[in-house]
Curated annotation (Swiss-Prot):
It holds the Pfam family SlyX. It comes from the Bacteria. InterPro entries: SlyX. Belongs to the SlyX family. This is Protein SlyX homolog. The lineage of its organism: Bacteria, Pseudomonadati, Pseudomonadota, Alphaproteobacteria, Hyphomicrobiales.
Amino acid sequence: MTNEIKTLSERIDTLETRLAYQDDTIETLNQTITAQWKQIDALTRQIAQLSERLQEAETNAPGPANERPPHY
């Protein structure tokens, strides 16, 4: 019976150690995902701004209908 208790105690210690490592890994992954979402949000805002600037530039640029052909 004492051998069984020792074996069970070792198994519990092993499981507690693995759980501690898993908790640390989960926290690290959570921090990484949070940082990535912040970066994705910043990039999304930047793309929206660039798209808006491009549309403004296209609106203000003279179109081909207003330009004379190169041979004139």
